[in-house]
Amino acid sequence: MQTQGEASNPLERNIELSVSREKVEAEVGVRLKRLAPKVKVQGFRPGKVPLKIVAQQYGHQVEHEVLGELLQQQFNDAVNQENYRVAGIPGFESRNSDANGATSYEFRATFEIYPDIELGDLSSITVNKPVLQIGDAEIQKTLDILRKQRATYEPTDRPAQTGDRVTIDYRGVLDGEGFPGGQADDYSVILGNGHLLEDFESSILGMTAGQEKTFDMTFPADYPGKDVAGKKVSFTIRLNKLEAPKLPEVDGEFAKSLGVAEGDIDKMRSEIKANLQREISQRIRTKLKEQVMQSLLDKVLIQVPKVLIRQEADRLAEEMQNSRAARGFRKDQSLSGDVFLEKAERRVRLGLILSKLIDTHELSVKPEQVRSFIEEYAQGYENPEQVIKWHYASPERLKEIEPLILEDNAVSWLLDKAKIIDQSVTFDELMGYSHATNV
């Protein structure tokens, strides 16, 4: 067994492995004898099948299993001897030029290792903390949003405008041909909710029910569907149905629809304020987290195993496909992990750095943190106690929460060391959303 440090990238390693053919054959013989009493072959009584026939039928399979196990054992011994932390699954390449005449099976294992990470000095991190006071204006804006969420829709003859619900057929053509995800029938969407690309939505605005139009638009260069990203596409849209929103009045019935059983409007406003404060606190925390995470990436520079990047990119692509399917779109077969390589590299790199930070400073999860996390999460539901009981009814559910708390512990540790600068923001700035990338 030889180990080599030669590598085509800083994290790649090669190990030369040698497994004795005699050792393989001996173990194969032992296993075939153990298997023989269980083998059933027509013409022979159970347990009386000759070993030669057992070997003819199962020898190759057993040899493959034995060689694989011995090879994996040798590989494990080699990486332990070198103190390698293997990332992903190794690849094994046969090195036998004449397998029949060889006294041993020769293989080269190629794999990547996790990088050594030096965290360095993290005390110089500076973050801007959003500051927002909740007043009547913020409560009223939230009320308006809640009314829009509970709007009913009625057909209208006027031109389409933001806030309307439209039902459309659309067909997209690229170089005279259709493309995956570029067509749909009776697709309903509310204009202005961020579910459509801006150029696509702006072409619907001003249309009337029954109208059909054709227009050209260019997909963003970073659009997930690589077949159309950055390309000019021709779309034909037919507006089948146009409906205008009708907002509910702010009265006792509206309060009851928000879970205020008595229909007390003042109590409703108080609950809105409490919920709004909780959401604002979460958003502020998210903003702080984004900044300290970026600071970590800027300050701790490491190499990342390519195999981990590829795994994460493929996972993100599958996640996108499932998301499209859940919204009624057909899966885009052209969507591959290649589109997500940059995002995947960032996520993997950040995950490795966070793991090092958590281990170095022993940022373990405490039972009271789990309880606090679940209780805060449950406040967003109508029956918090039921949500809490549901989580504690399953150890697996509690286990799923631990990574979130570990990450939060890391953020808290970094914020304790960071310089925090208060920065006033508006309600719209803090609560705003970005446009989605759907067609």
UniProtKB/Swiss-Prot annotation:
Coiled-coil stretches noted in the UniProt entry, renumbered to this chain: none
Gene Ontology biological-process entries: 'de novo' cotranslational protein folding; cell division; chaperone-mediated protein folding; protein transport; protein unfolding
Assigned keywords, A-Z: Cell cycle, Cell division, Chaperone, Cytoplasm, Isomerase, Rotamase
Gene3D superfamilies, per the entry: 3.10.50.40, Trigger factor ribosome-binding domain (3.30.70.1050), Trigger factor, C-terminal domain (1.10.3120.10)
Protein location: Cytoplasm
The UniProt record lists the keyword Oxidoreductase: no
GO cellular component, one term: cytoplasm
Reactions performed catalytically: [protein]-peptidylproline (omega=180) = [protein]-peptidylproline (omega=0)
Span of domain PPIase FKBP-type: 163-248
Principal place of residence: cytoplasm
Molecular functions (GO terms): peptidyl-prolyl cis-trans isomerase activity; protein folding chaperone; ribosome binding
EC assignment: 5.2.1.8
Family according to the record: Belongs to the FKBP-type PPIase family. Tig subfamily.
Recorded domain comment: Consists of 3 domains; the N-terminus binds the ribosome, the middle domain has PPIase activity, while the C-terminus has intrinsic chaperone activity on its own.
Main function: Involved in protein export. Acts as a chaperone by maintaining the newly synthesized protein in an open conformation. Functions as a peptidyl-prolyl cis-trans isomerase.
Annotated HAMAP family: Trigger_factor_Tig
Name under which the protein is recorded: Trigger factor
Gene source species: Nitrosomonas europaea (strain ATCC 19718 / CIP 103999 / KCTC 2705 / NBRC 14298)
Gene, per the UniProt record: tig
